[in-house]
Amino acid sequence: MLMKQINLSLVFILLFSCSKDFDRKELNFLNQNFKQWNEYLGDKARTHYSSLNQINKSNVKTLKKVWEYKSGDLNGKNTTQIQCSPIVIDSILYGTNPVTKLFAINAKTGKELWKFDHGQDVGPGWWGVNRGLIYWDDKVDGRIIYTSGSYIYSVDALTGKIENTFGDKGKIDLRKNLGRPFETLSVVANTPGVVYKNILIQGTRVHEGPGASPGHIRAYDLDTGDLVWRFNTIPQPGEYGYETWPKDAYKYVGGANSWAGMTLDEETGIVYIPTGSASYDFWGGNRKGENLFANSLIALDANNGNRLWHFQFVHHDLWDRDLPAPPNLVNINIEGKLIKAVAQVTKSGHVFVFDRKTGNHIFPVKEFPFPKSELEDEESWPTQPLPTKIPPFARQEFTKDMINDMFPNSKALLAWTPNQKEKVSDKTIKEVFETLNSQGQFHPHSEEKRSITFPGLDGGAEWGGAAFDPNSGWLYVNSNEMPWVSIANKYDTPKEWEWQLKKDPVKSYGKSIYSQQCSRCHGADLDGISNIPGLKNLKNKFNKNELSLIIKNGKGSMMPMPQVSESQIKAMTAFLLDDDNIDLDLNSFRELDPNIVPYSINYFGRFMDENGYPAVKPPWGTLNAIDLNKGEIVWQVPLGEYEELTKQGFSITGTENYGGPILTDGGLIFIGATNDEY
């Protein structure tokens, strides 16, 4: 736990340690010596590596806190978080606070130099998450480029003043230039893009339900904010990959976005961009086909956005298997030959390694057959690619012999967090397991039987990504091993005039829209999930106008929903308020298709026991070292601890973990990722 508490302060110390000069050719594979931390995750190669070695295995235990900075905006509801990985430029540390206000502090003293307030009302949810910053040397004072909500801001690095010559008075609206009416789009960017020459290349995060925004990759001129190029991740007529979708999919399908960040090889001018699934994530009957470039690693010419090569990790994704982190540029030695490669970790617990220029596999990958989906109108892809040389760093299937037997008589809990005690079953973990479908990766969801996703929705690997040691060629990645449980719920989706046959057509329509857009967070039964509130008895709290505004504009951690039309908002309001007096022209229901989907995949959440421990045997979180020269896992250890279990004599179990590792030449790995906050 000490490592987690000191992680940020320690990073700052590492960045400012003086280092003797030395010549190591093996360190200079990107014409740098890894002594700076002026880029997200250390450098544009995303190595997470520092060559500084003054802090090492012999003295790390003597580290003490030398200063503390309070960034402000603490949320009293215990939902405050800072995901931002700071950067340091000329002894100034830049970061963002819980509501994404940008700050600059003296990295030696912790004294605040300035703070920039964007003036947006962002909450603690994904709408207000920022994971990193970009410094751009504009040959004047330098600028900090960062995102908050739907905007990219350009701020003077020395003064904290916005650069009014950039974009629209210092900012760019990420909802624009996507080929659809921007007022109807919900778009943010929680991870920084990358700068090549004077071009900013930026990905986005979008809504994951029906009607989501497309995830096209865009490049902007950093002097003006003007759009330079756009790569369509959902191809349009005449573009490569267009035939892998229905002919009009580019008009209505969303997602295939890059929320995880990207990686740049400045020597070749190639940018490597990982993407997520198409929306809706769990049912694809309205997007039949392979769905390029969703779930892909795309190599683009950074000058113009032209595609050089790509690889798709999941065809026609139905499991939300987004690529979770930017890839690592790696130099590896295979049988005496130097290979310049790019390595991508996945939520399913795999590492894929490619030749940087050609996209050829360095280690073999094979297409494996998987069962066909039985859901209405769904056409799952018959095969999925998996590596056959590098072993997975997470277990791939939850089998009966893996049931947690630490407390054999414990009842089962199906919930997002262990705080939902009301969802404790009257059956044991083993008894509940017997009722579930657990067949491993890429098995389709079912209407008839609840299914286990393992590793769960949060990996495998997560957004913290992997670290690469350029000396050894080893990759270090943390991983989750938590089972999640789901079932496909079919709901009423009549078309056009058929709604008129319903007993309460307006409220029925509203319930259908709610199921698609809101049930994933607030629950299919309006009871809420985890710390997300339930929506029962809203008529005692809001009138129809107040509730309509909340649905449209969002509130707190709830994102705005511009993709929901006025008639849909009216119908949802009627349903949520149980109001029979809201009139709606039934002809407006004709606007439904093509984004109406007949299923909501209801995630009961993590499969745990009544004490909040995972239903699967440990380890529940691991740290892994993988030798990319040989394609072998060198070691794997539990990451994280439940102290109360250790005191009872159990071996360290590991915990779920999200942040990524930092690797140093002092022989150390620092990682502040686990949830064991004692």
Describe these PLM feature segments.
Residues 188, 501-508, 512-515, 520, ...:
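Extracytoplasmic electron-transfer domains, predominantly the class I c-type cytochrome c fold
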Residues 37-41, 79-99, 125-152, 185-209, ...:
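Repeat-blade elements of multi-bladed beta-propeller folds
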Residues 188-221, 318-403, 458-467, 563-571:
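Repeat-solenoid scaffold signature
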Residues 24-66, 233-240, 412-447, 588-600, ...:
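Blade/loop signatures of beta-propeller domains
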Residues 14-17:
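C-terminal motif of bacterial Sec signal peptides marking the signal peptidase cleavage site
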Residues 43, 394, 403, 407-415, ...:
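Periplasmic c-type cytochrome electron-transfer domains
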Residues 59-72, 102-123, 140, 152-184, ...:
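Extracytoplasmic/lumenal domain signature
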Residues 84-99, 458-486, 497-522, 592-678:
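C-terminal substrate/ligand-recognition segments
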